[in-house]
């Protein structure tokens, strides 16, 4: 047992040799002692090793082709958006690693600035789902925020720093990991200012929020309230550097296509000019021709657009794509509902024309892929109510008439077993 002096009254740390008077705390074990300073040192060593293990290694990071292939398994269509996201994420971590190498070598190197992403496209076409699916693949902190809840500092609503808090929480409050994470800001079109011209009055949920987002998009040392909510002077803040945080902002931008058409339509003037009808533009990807001036006219400020150099657009989903979404992805809706019915011992089947009818309804409602689940819930509600209470059903078949004419699905009765037939005859 570690003791000091002839009397052996003072105990000492078995690792550093300091006496109990030289340290704040001495913890005893079976025949050994350890002081608080040695415990702190051990914790630091463990944290450093864990941090090194969590760092994204370039050779371990999926290549753009691999990222796109993973997205293909869950998201139908939107090939351009998949490629853009895959390249942006890969380059984001290459840039971070290049910065770390230049700091280690202490030599003058080319500074690589980040390229945040703006995603445009109609509602229900997969913008949010693409980001959520991407999060499954990457071992990095990932947070999704809603721009509609944000207001300028000092007004009722959420500060922009609360977006960073979600990222810190996703990293289990490991600020170092959070500083290399990804933030997806949805509904960014809702913070467009109310008119193209700068307003004299304050626009606290529009232009004011855009101004507040500028610094964290570009890269700054932000102070984040650890419990969220508004800042007040009598609280400690979490400091986070957003220089290496990749931002993906997205919105439906309803009405932007008209602005694009007005600009593109002006090309059809004079002899030999190519004249395209509005229908021709609308049937293709009208967001593919977006220019910064279109976004400014929509209501985004030039400084905000300048911090989003990469623009990716998603297109309206046609009938064929919606049918594929229903049945082909790994977690397709048909597979999900089939599994639900299997748990009750019943087989579920959709005919091909039933899937087409569901896709037609989604197009008619204008809800895109997001509306498919609601339609299927309506179609299956009667049988999902009855089936759990019945033991005579083997199969449920959903047809085109079930979807279009509110006809009940076809019920295929279960054949009684030999013992049941014997009991019945007895």
UniProtKB/Swiss-Prot annotation:
InterPro entries assigned: AAA+_ATPase (IPR003593), ATP-dep_Clp_protease_ClpX (IPR050052), ATPase_AAA_core (IPR003959), Clp_ATPase_C (IPR019489), Clp_protease_ATP-bd_su_ClpX (IPR004487), ClpX_bact (IPR046425), P-loop_NTPase (IPR027417), Znf_CppX_C4 (IPR010603)
Designated name of the protein: ATP-dependent Clp protease ATP-binding subunit ClpX
Domain ClpX-type ZB: 1-54
GO annotation (BP), single: proteolysis involved in protein catabolic process
Gene from which the chain derives: clpX
SMART domains: AAA, ClpB_D2-small, zf-C4_ClpX
Residues engaged in binding Zn(2+): 13, 16, 35, 38
Binding site for ATP: 122-129
Top-level taxon of origin: Bacteria
GO molecular function (one): unfolded protein binding
Function according to Swiss-Prot or TrEMBL: ATP-dependent specificity component of the Clp protease. It directs the protease to specific substrates. Can perform chaperone functions in the absence of ClpP.
